[in-house]
Amino acid sequence: MAENNNNNNNNNNNNVSTPPHQKPHLTTGLRTSSSGLLMDKRRQDEEKFSAEQVAMGKKSPTKLFSAYSLNDLSNPPTDEELNNYKDLPASSLPPIHKREKLRRVFVNRDIKLDRIEFFGFDMDYTLAVYNSPDFEELAYDMVLDKLIDIGYPKSIRKLKYDPNFPTRGLFLDRELGNLLKIDSFGNIIICVHGRTTLSKNRTAEFYPSMRVSSDEIARNRFYLLNTLFTLPEACLYADLVDHLERESGLRLTEEVADEQQQMNSPPLSSLGSESVRIDESNHQPEGDLSFSNLFQDVRTACDLVHNDGSLKTRVLDDLPRYIRKTPDMPVFFDRLRQNKNKVFLLTNSEFYYTNKVMSYMMNGYNPNYQSWRDYFDVIIVGADKPRFFSEGTTIREVDTETGNLRITNVKDRFEQGKVYHGGSLSLFQKLTGAKGSRVLYIGDHIFADIIKSKKTHGWRNLLVVPELQHELEVMNQQKDTTIHLMNLEFIRAEIYRGLDSESTTPPDIEVLHQHLKNTNDKLNFAYNKYFGSLFKNGSKSTFFSMQVQRYADLYTSDYLNLLNYPLFYHFCANSLPLPHESSSFSSFDTSN
């Protein structure tokens, strides 16, 4: 019944008292039932029946009304009411109250917030929301500069980041230079080379099975672009493929350098930023540049920009431009503190960057907190996730005045206000007692934040998917297109009605298939003109969608959407029916 609370939770009616002889009704003032007239008629019939039973001596007059309708239930209902409640048909139930989609937390697995003792947070792209496309444009331009420094033609400097091109969940084929969108079973949905979307026939020439096999993924032929930090990387790689093939006269080859050579050649990230160069042993002879080599150079340049501090320095120089600041953030953390929850920060960022970003976002809002550090019970920077969740690293204490590290002997507990660097999950659990389902960890990185913490240690999790806001907006705008697609799929099913093994002439559905394709293309184009929706392609779920369903207990566009729920809330997941079950209650949705 928790969903019957409206968006302001349980504080909305504080000024309205309910007389002791009146109990609030389940539906009164909370939702309007389209079947209200039917309920009134039903109650009249029930009261008439009860009166007849009394007149016949079959029922005690002390209780004329023994069958409760939906409008009669208290909020929450009593045991007597539930025992005497008469069910409505599923089709007659009024719509379940749901929060506005843009403010909702979506549920894959049940979580009771009042059983969560520890709330943990990542920083980058979770607490620190980077303003798009400004941040991606900055990263894109800085990686371009690195590539020019190591010998790429200066003509690439004219390339610009296109926020309408990249999406997460793509597979980059190192051998052929293609970007692939695949479904949850590994089937190729879309193939893009440079900025050109390839036809199915052309795609099948490269991938005869039209699948990405697990063996090919295991041998690292495909690189999964799964984080928000990889958006500029995906765009730049595609732009370089186009530019180098069409304009610079360089010949990109499909040949892959010898694996032993690749193992023996030092990565660019091992070199100082002032002496970055291309190791010629790692490139094709006769001046050819392979797609694999191009990927390695782009990947390494991206790592350099992130690891040498240059990108972070630019962000810190103009925090309002690159990072969101909202007063809701300290409000949310104050509510966690008031609720006696333990709160920890677990980030891979170093202290100097974490301190300046968190100070910018949280300091100065609440006089009860002198520093952003006061909102947290434990602060760990330089965590080196996902390694933190396995063997970990040596834990050190950070001198918050100088930023220097010192070896510390943490025996009994982490001290509030202090900042620690590195460590491991085993040590964290030993010192805090935070284990398993009592921990809710909130992050944006499916692998480093979600999969490792969940599969290895049973932490509950909330995945932040900022793209969800755009997806929901497009879904709302394209309702008519979606309904038309559903109609076409229904028509296709009807064409085969009654056909069995005696039927020998297949129906001609070429025209219908073309309409289905055109409608599906229109819908995909509304999300992203190259790759479509992050979660769907028509009725097919994407690989990214599969990961979200499999590993994320909860997911939302912004962690601050938790402000729309009381901290005792019970998130209930939909019961997902098998195909043979779905027809029974196809219109009955009990999601949050």
Curated annotation (Swiss-Prot):
User: Which residues take part in binding Mg(2+)?
Assistant: 122, 124, 444
Oligomeric and partner information = Homotetramer.
> So where does IMP get bound?
122, 124, 299, 303, 312, 347-349, 385
Task: Name the chain's protein.
Answer: Cytosolic purine 5'-nucleotidase
What are the alphabetically sorted keywords of the record?
ATP-binding, Cytoplasm, Hydrolase, Magnesium, Metal-binding, Nucleotide metabolism, Nucleotide-binding, Transferase
- Required cofactor(s): Mg(2+)
Family matches, as InterPro entries: HAD-like_sf, HAD-SF_hydro_IG_5-nucl, HAD_sf, Pur_nucleotidase
Recorded catalytic reaction(s): these are: a ribonucleoside 5'-phosphate + H2O = a ribonucleoside + phosphate; a 2'-deoxyribonucleoside + a ribonucleoside 5'-phosphate = a ribonucleoside + a 2'-deoxyribonucleoside 5'-phosphate
- Family to which this protein belongs: Belongs to the 5'(3')-deoxyribonucleotidase family.
Annotated binding of ATP, by residue: 226, 547, 550
Region of interest (Disordered), ranges: 1-37, 252-273
* SUPFAM superfamilies referenced in this protein's UniProt entry, alphabetically: HAD-like
Q: What is its EC number?
A: 3.1.3.5, 2.7.1.77
Q: Name its cellular compartments.
A: Cytoplasm, Cytosol
Which GO molecular function entries does the Swiss-Prot or TrEMBL record give? 5'-nucleotidase activity; ATP binding; GMP 5'-nucleotidase activity; IMP 5'-nucleotidase activity; metal ion binding; nucleoside phosphotransferase activity
Coiled coil start-end: none
Q: How is the cofactor bound?
A: Binds 1 Mg(2+) ion per subunit.
Task: Spell out the Low complexity composition-biased ranges.
Answer: 1-15
Q: What is its main location?
A: cytoplasm
**Polar residues bias located where?**
259-273
State any GO BP term from the record.
Answer: dGMP metabolic process
